[in-house]
A protein has these predicted regions:
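Short solvent-exposed loop/turn micro-motifs enriched in small/polar/acidic residues
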Residues: 33-34
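Basic/polar, cationic surfaces and motifs that engage anionic cell-wall
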Residues: 1-11, 15, 44-48, 53-54, ...
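Short, surface-exposed beta-strand/loop micro-motifs that present aromatic residues
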Residues: 59-62
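Short Gly/aromatic-enriched secondary-structure transition segments
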Residues: 21-28
Length: 132
């Protein structure tokens, strides 16, 4: 896969039992998908879990799955500091390893006006600043 952008998402649930990559995967399988739609999942503690293999097209943003890396954090109320730092780590790795430009980071809402996901203003974050 050749990715040219990153799209950020949230699970839209603050229920602790939902903060699990396997729960998200099962939700997506119940929808008839063949796997979790996101390439990475970040839990409340900032732990990063692999989702759909990056060699496969995601299923996270209609009309943009072919060229985007999908990252989802657990929660509905905006990411905490640990989750933001984890996002930055993935974004910087995507830039270094996959040649994704750092100015090509979007929220799901950028591509679907009916969405607020990832429930924070992606444009206010300086993704170029160091992740560590």
């Amino acid at each position: 896969m050749k990715f040219n952008k990153i799209i950020l998402h949230c699970s839209d649930s603050d229920i602790p039992a939902h903060d699990n990559v396997q729960v998200i995967r099962s939700w997506h399988l119940q929808r008839g998908w063949n796997d979790i739609g996101y390439h990475y999942y970040i839990n409340y503690f900032g732990d990063i879990f692999p989702g759909r293999n990056i060699s496969r097209q995601g299923a996270h943003c209609k009309n943009h799955n072919k060229d985007s890396l999908g990252i989802c954090y657990g929660g509905a109320s905006g990411p905490n500091v640990k989750q933001l730092l984890a996002m930055k780590r993935i974004i910087h790795a995507g830039h270094i390893l996959l040649d994704i430009p750092l100015n090509e980071v979007y929220g799901h809402y950028h591509f679907n006006s009916g969405k607020t996901c990832p429930n924070f203003d992606v444009d206010k974050i300086n993704w170029r600043r160091g992740a560590y």
